[in-house]
Each structure stands twice: as C-alpha cells, then as structure tokens.
Amino acid sequence: MDFFIDATDNNARACTIKTSHSTIKTPVFMPVGTAASVKSLDTVDLRDILQTQIILANTYHLYLRPGDNVVKKLGGLHGFTGYNRSFLTDSGGFQAFSLSDISKANERGIEFQSHIDGSKHFFTPQKVLDIQYNLGSDIMMILDDLVALPATKERLALSVDRTTRWAQESIKYHKKMQAQGIGTNQNIFAIIQGGTDYEFRKKSAMELTALDFDGFAIGGLSVGEENSVMYNTVEFTTPFMPKNKPRYLMGVGTPEDLVECIDRGVDMFDCVMPTRNARNGTIFTSFGRLNIKAAKYKLDQNPIDEACSCYTCQNYTRAYLNHLYRAKELTYYRLASIHNLHYYLTLMKEAREAIEKGEYKAFKKAFYARRQS
C-alpha cells in the first residue's frame, strides 16, 4: 500500500491511499457491505453510479455464511462480488460480542455462539487473519478487545494490554505468512482502544504505533457517549498516530461527526447510518434530515435535494419516493440508499477540495449554516 499526504489545513488532511485494486482519495467514507453486499445495491450501483473506491465487508458474517473458504474458492471478495476495487474487512470481534448471547474473551481470543445456528466458535488473532487471507481484502483489521462504555479503569487497562498483545501476535503472524507468499497484497491495521480515558488512549496508541502496521484505527467510540466526548477523545488521540499512515475512525457516523473528525485529523470512516436510515425513511440532504414518509411529500414534485446531482435526485421526485416507501416497494430502498451514500461521498469530496484550498474552516462554517437556514 502506498500512502501520500497531498494537502493539510491545520489538522485536516487530504491524502491518497493506493492498494492493488484502487486509488482512494481521502477523506473517504466507506459504505458498509456486511455480507459482501451493501444492502439494496449491486456492484454497478457502487462502482459506476456512486463511483466508490472502497467498501467494507464483515469478517464475522462471511466466516459464518457462506464461509471464508467458499469465498476463497470463488475468487475472494473481488471475484465473488464482481466489485474490483478495494475492500476493507473488520476483524469480526465486535459482532462476536454484540450478536452472540454467549460470548467471552480470554487471553487467547473471543469465544462466541453463532447468531445463525448457535454453533460455538473461537476467534484468535491468527484465526481472524486466516479468514481475511481467504477473503482477500485489501485492508485487514486485527482482533482487538472491545469495551462497552462506561467501563472501569481495571477493564480499560485489561482491554489495552490485551489489544497490544493481540497486535503483537497479529503483526508477527502476518510477517510470517507474507514470507510464505500469503497476504502479500493485503495490508493490516491495528485498533487503538482505551475508551474515553486519555491515559489509556495514549498508552494504547504509543504501544501499537511502535509496531509495523500499515495503518491505525480508533475503535471503541460512538457507543453512546456524548458527541463532545467523542470529538475530544479523537482530538486527543490523533497526534499520537503516525502522520505517514492512514487514520481510520471506526463506526462513525453522522455527517456532523465526519465534518468534526476530519477537522481533528481522521482520514477514513465507515458507518451503516446512510443506508440504514435510508431504509427507515430518513434522507440526508444539504439542509439537514428529511423524513420522506411524511404526508406533506405526497404531492411534492421536487427532487429530494435541489443541490444534489445523484441518480435519484436527477430522475425522481419526493412524491415518488414517498409513494414507494409507503407501498413498501423494494425500489425505494435502492433509490434512497443511492441518494444517502451519494450525499456522504460528496461531502467527503467537498471536504477534500476545501482542505486542498486551505479553506476547511470556511467549509465547516458553511456546512452548519446550510443546516440552520
């Protein structure tokens, strides 16, 4: 993976990431394709209509169904899906915790039950990398020890120490596998933990960045804490992350979150919000959120957003989207998801242009002004 810093504006960064499958301009938002599919969208939508360069897929879900060995036999994620740009896969640790009625972590890894059939499984640092080697993703996230907030200092200390040990195991194993010709085009990111405690965040960041990872993520945020607490934690953490490697904030978030965290030095984001909210009738626009299921849109012949150039806004009206939603037509999910993702991706493109011009402060001010007008 090649990484270049193209421009900075205070802490905001415009960078370029080159994998073996695509060139990614940052700041970048990665649509979430949990089971190797962004819900309601196909590869043509993602590649040609939305022009994405990277999407996220989920290790836990693909391990359980159809199985990572099946994906490998079918050409890895790229051959399996026909999406020939970059994939980032997470470690599956979050899902092992959140979707299992019985899950527990120990020094070796995470034991959990499948949410599909109740079968028992065990994720170790090596196991999640083996799964991701089979998936053939461009960026692999290592196993980390997740902590629900609020957490005691004892639990945070355990999480940070365990995450560091697993990171050491992961990088050692990855180097060994690459020496055998496995995963040579795959990059590996570590995940900084520590909750909202600055002491533990610094400890985790310092220990992980001493290891030879290709990039670093901030994990364990956007789990119910106040926005200001999350922003402050990100602002505290990013200075301890290498300038010459990508910085990824996991599972975040709203358009406001992205604008604020770009300002604090983050390059990469992912979240289910744009597609999940689309399916539930909430549309993101340049002037804020729009509830497309509201009765007032029944006869509205305007596009969702006059300022939007997306496929949906160029071809369909609010009235039609309102009808599709109320009729539970499957077409609604596609058109609404295309719009919401286009909004997120365009926001990232505009943020990059502002950084390149040294005008991010003005961009941020205008972003909020449009929402208050």
From Swiss-Prot:
Cofactor(s) required, per the database record: Zn(2+)
Keywords: Glycosyltransferase, Metal-binding, Queuosine biosynthesis, Transferase, tRNA processing, Zinc
The protein's enzyme class: transferase
GO cellular component assignments: cytosol
Keyword Transferase listed: yes
GO aspect biological process, one term: queuosine biosynthetic process
Name listed for the protein in its UniProt record: Queuine tRNA-ribosyltransferase
